[in-house]
């Protein structure tokens, strides 16, 4: 995974692009809003400084091949409405974790489902991933439904030692991509 340029992805109505400093307000909102973070334990970015620091950190991690973090925007609009990423790559680069968040004003419209499909396709086809994992809260029904729609299955018996309320799902590369 060495990219000269950030791999922008598009769907019929979305653009998944590189995170920019100008996205700081949405980053701050997504990482600080109580509704968005109800099931997530992570550092907030409740100030412009913290949000910009987060963006700089993400872009440094991209340059060192640790993360692919896409800003989700509606096609032909620049405004960030959410994010989706592949990160926490295994040592052999065959497994990655997927993470995502979305402004509540845009939820329940298929946006994250559409984003996840294009990111999974990219991960399996272009990165050569064999498996993608997702860690989600056991009571986050919307996230669980999204994962199941995208063929993730619950990994029985696997736990997150840092948070026992987290359940772990995984999806394998589809046979048609295996080549």
Where does each model-flagged region fall?
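Short loop/turn motifs at secondary-structure junctions and domain boundaries
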Residues: 60-65
